């Protein structure tokens, strides 16, 4: 083993986390075996015995959205029964999707010292964060992923703080998804018999947004680790663009089995987040999902997390309780909910249970 690699492996946390090399830096050194810090417990690895190969999440064609009410019904049904679905003919130009994927690769190919300007200790703002794994300080085993997280406040702040390697493409992707997000939420609210989205509800449903750029390098011994561990998102909705490599798995509702989300060129993956599960009083389901590591290819994904504002109180919508439903969830300050999520390692649906009424 070369001396440099031996030194890195003896100080992986410094190399990967503190020096900004990320797991990409490890992979670029030509590792032949997975470092022990990334070996996941067996119960956290996905196996062929738990995967259903002949099933997958719904794919919904939005081309007739304006004229066919069945499209809205399909969206609501998918949110109830799966919590995940793919959309095609959504109106976001293919070139916008391809450009943001190219920009993601461009950022992660920057030198470590350039990326490290945006790490937790160096970034001029908490709204811009480059990092690795999920919460390295709280994890027993690290996840095989690097990320750039960009919390959107304004175009002016983005121009000043977001990395120039990907800033314009990320903003363009977000802007192009806005109309789709609003229509999806309108359909989902209609399914709850909520006919008016006033300013308060708009804040609860889409008051803030965060876009992540995720990079999963090819991995030695991918069967021993994970790209992302089991979790549900804390968002209202997540709008996910994935590349053609694949590797995203979704847990079937009320089951211990998983299904693959196959890449479809031009499609966008939509999933219900915890906030919408709580707002809908459990009608719409945020579902556990995970990403496996890949031994042959690098993989990227670009999710937009559509969230309440940090100072919003989330709880079952008044219209549902006024119709006689019993509240399943308590009212929670959204920023407290998010802090609870990020203080620990990925742990399935534990965070949404935090908001349940016992």
UniProtKB/Swiss-Prot annotation:
Entries under InterPro entries matching the protein: DIOX_N, IPNS-like_FE2OG_OXY, IPNS-like_sf, Oxoglu/Fe-dep_dioxygenase_dom, Plant_2OG-oxidoreductases
Pathways involved: Phenylpropanoid metabolism
Binding sites annotated in the UniProt record for Fe cation: 231, 233, 289
GO biological process: one example: response to molecule of fungal origin
Binding site for 2-oxoglutarate: 216, 299, 301
Swiss-Prot/TrEMBL catalytic activity: (E)-feruloyl-CoA + 2-oxoglutarate + O2 = (E)-6-hydroxyferuloyl-CoA + succinate + CO2
Cofactor note: Binds 1 Fe(2+) ion per subunit.
pH dependence (record): Optimum pH is 6.5.
Principal EC category: oxidoreductase
Entry GO MF terms: 2-oxoglutarate-dependent dioxygenase activity; metal ion binding
Tissues in which the UniProt entry reports expression: Expressed at low levels in tubers, underground stems, leaves and petioles.
Documented EC number(s): 1.14.11.61
Family matches, as Gene3D superfamilies: B-lactam Antibiotic, Isopenicillin N Synthase, Chain
Residues of the Fe2OG dioxygenase domain: 200-308
Alphabetic keyword roster: Dioxygenase, Iron, Metal-binding, Oxidoreductase
Function of the protein: 2-oxoglutarate (OG)- and Fe(II)-dependent dioxygenase (2OGD) involved in scopoletin biosynthesis. Converts feruloyl CoA into 6'-hydroxyferuloyl CoA, and, at low efficiency, caffeoyl-CoA into 6'-hydroxycaffeate, but has no activity with p-coumaroyl-CoA.
Family per record: Belongs to the iron/ascorbate-dependent oxidoreductase family.
Record-given protein name: Feruloyl CoA ortho-hydroxylase F6H1-2
Lineage: Eukaryota, Viridiplantae, Streptophyta, Embryophyta, Tracheophyta
Gene expressing this chain: F6H1-2
